[in-house]
Amino acid sequence: MSEKLVLIDGHSILNRASFGIPDLTNSEGLHTNAVYGFLNIMFKILEEEQPDYLTVAFDVSEPTFRHKMFAEYKGTRKPMAAELKQQVPLMKEMLRAMGVTIVEKGGYEADDLLGTIAKRSEAAGVEVAVVSGDRDLLQLATDHIKIRIPKTKRTGTEIEDYNAKEVLEKYQVTPTEFIDVKALMGDTSDNIPGVPGIGEKTATAIIAKYGSIENAYVHVDELKPPRASTNLKEHYDMAQMSKTLATIDIDADIAYKLADAHLEQVSDLYTEEAYLLCKRLEFKNLLGRFSVEAPKNTAEEHFKKIEKAQEAEAFFASLRGKACGFYVVPQEETHDAHTEADGQMNLFGSFAMQNSGEEAGQQETAGSCHIPDFLGLAVACGEEEICYVEASEALPCRKIRELFAGSAAASYATLDLKPQLKELGMLEKKCLGTISEENLFDNTIAAYLLNPIKNEYPYEDIAKDYAGLMISSRKDLIEKLTYEKAAEKKPEEFLKCVCYMAYVAYKTREPLEKELADTGMEALFREIEMPLVFTLADMEKEGIIASGEALKEYGDKLAVRIDELERKIYEEAGEEFNINSPKQLGVILFEKLSLPNGKKTKTGYSTAADVLDRLAPDYPIVADILEYRQLTKLKSTYADGLVNYIAEDGRIHTSFNQTITATGRLSSTEPNLQNIPMRIELGRLIRKAFLPKSGFVFVDADYSQIELRVLAHLSGDEKLIEAYRNAQDIHRTTASQVFHIPFDEVTDLQRRNAKAVNFGIVYGISSFGLSQDLSITKKEAAEYIERYFETYPKIKGYLDGLVAEAKEKGYVTTMFGRRRPIPELSSSNFMQRSFGERIAMNSPIQGTAADIIKIAMNRVHDRLLAEGLKSRLILTVHDELLVETAAEEEQEVRKILAEEMHGAAQLSVMLEIDVHAGSDWYQAK
């Protein structure tokens, strides 16, 4: 059997991969999609070909012999996109790490190097596969040289294969004649001129008949159509030059030895160096290809399990005065890597369940919440002192907690502190013996502040980013097993996993602290985010009462209206169909009923909300469909969905997330209470199902127009500041100024439009976006925005300054120092850059508002406790705080909310709040 060589056109495949795969970046901000796509294509080819030799050719950015012949050669090509250009050296680094031979030489294109190597290898009896997205290489095809052209699609990579026979079948010319076709028709991508007036069809017909441009010229008077004859006579010299430009040099002056490209087996590419680079680039899906293990960290040799009380006592005593990292290993019900990156469950969703053994009866001071058992405690206080203290009958959780509380370490670092506070018994107390808020450090929150645009912060990423360590992930070690199952089935891997959690916390605390200080976010971390961990933990523990009966009643009312709408829609359509099927709905609306503006896609007509919103005012069936969608969403998500989250204590215990949004806003999951509808009355009615406990009321405080007030302060615009200081209706004031009409004559519509402009400006709205919101022309919207900036000139200067600063620094900051990186600003894609500019304008405003709300939450939470009140902060939704208030404490709680929320930040305008009380959340709002 003949030996086989695979040749890859480096730049071509990188370029194809970059367009086939959406932009990806790793935590360093490096664009990686082209490299990732290239590797997937290469692995696919190698698995299919199983070659004996492998070589990748790259272009060199200097003129070739073709440029000397024709200065305009490739002159019309756009420069390589910055995102792709950045990845070329990364690609070469990866290939070298794999031991792949790379060829490149000044004066030649990669095509010439590939052609030369392919022909030499064919002559030596080697079968050749050339992989490229460039069809120019089809001229190389023979019975022994196969051209493979990959197409990257969402469903995977498809490859077209061409030997000489396939070229002839598809293009009606031989591979060598393919050059002549290109010489006649030209090539706009390479700026090869060709012959004017001769396109692909005519060129193919001429060459198929005469075999070459030279022979065609001999028979020039016979050429059809006559225009081709005339033009070839006139431009024959250009045709010959075009042929030279299009011809791949198969005798390039390169020193290439086939033996140097030898590949014993494909698995030889999966080197340790390449593995580490894949880890760095965060190609998690590719790591499974590597049989190599992650390089062993020397700390692993010192991972140890402690089972005896005496040994545990000695170990905890040794922590005194040292910096340590720890991790409380929870009893998990399930492990979902997507929702809990570090594998911790939401402990508050089932806090009312009784515990067994010696923990039974131990209660938190604030309520009926028992301190739960845990599997054990991992602690690291040095490179050689990393232990997992396992809980058992001989060494119960109570004893471990007691020893840990008295350890008197200098500092305690951990990953994702909030879920561990319950096991430590630190809810509402903020301390456990010698462990307190002051000496605790949450590495996950620190990593989030330093790079808030990541999706998750698993321990292996934190280790890599802040300690330069490449370590095995939880998934690598124990797959999808819970900790309890892993301890039973994979004890060694389990020990590594939990010890790494503690070790990474210990190892990365100092570099994280240094980076926080260097970036000016130390105060943000210490004074806002760390106290918030305790605030949120207490709120999760408290939860909020949800009436299953009220939710059912609400759902039943929705069901009646949904049934009415369904019948009405069928009647209007003249037939029954699946209203929830976009395909069927599109056919009904745009074919049967012939509604205008139907946008047909590959899967059918678009029935997206923006399409239907424009039709609803004129077509009752569309208005009914929109209402139907709204009500079915309310029923499934809230009326039916929320019931599943009611715990045994009758409360819903949502999980608040501190490390999800790039702006610093909080989010919540299981369930998401941030999205409780507010715009429509039917949505607001859901709040009736949320109740205070007996003898209590809800007191709700909501910041009024906080983002606009922040904008007034940050921009320093005197008119906006004056309007707020005079307690004017800001939207009516804006309408009066923008539309040049007296304040008292502003109509409701004008006020509504001004409100859309006011809030739109905060989010960097474009004239197109505003035109869509207000159903006006783009020109009118642009005029509104222009007049707005004329009215408030300093706002325009401020927003422009934010964009300029972001372009220079790569990030923007809030009033409290929170950073928001904006990689989109360096994109070559206009839409991405425009999106980046909107982020630059909005993030400092939205982020500052988020910081203020967090400060207010901490202050309200702490003051309720400090004053010994029974009332508790239980929920936050955007700019709103909800306190479950003892009836006799209502006035005091109102006072606390007003003082602490007003005082959360000192702005040039007052932070106003609206405070209401009620017997359910609806009434309180």
What are these regions (language model features)?
Residues 484-485, 541, 597, 639, ...:
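Conserved catalytic core of nucleic-acid polymerases
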Residues 235-391, 487-678, 691, 697, ...:
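Conserved "right-hand" nucleotidyltransferase catalytic core of DNA-directed polymerases
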Residues 18, 72-86, 143-173, 229-231, ...:
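Short alpha-helix plus adjacent loop in nuclease-associated cores
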Residues 2-3, 22-26, 75-253:
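Extended two-metal-dependent nuclease catalytic cores across DNA- and RNA-processing enzymes
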Residues 380-383, 412, 416, 450-481, ...:
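Function-dense linear segments that define catalytic or interfacial modules
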Residues 5-6, 16-55, 71-72, 76-83, ...:
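Conserved RNase H-like, two-metal-ion catalytic cores of nucleic-acid enzymes
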Residues 560-567, 571-623, 790-838, 842, ...:
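C-terminal polymerase-core module
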Residues 516-528, 532, 852, 856-877, ...:
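Active-site palm subdomain of RNA-directed nucleic acid polymerases
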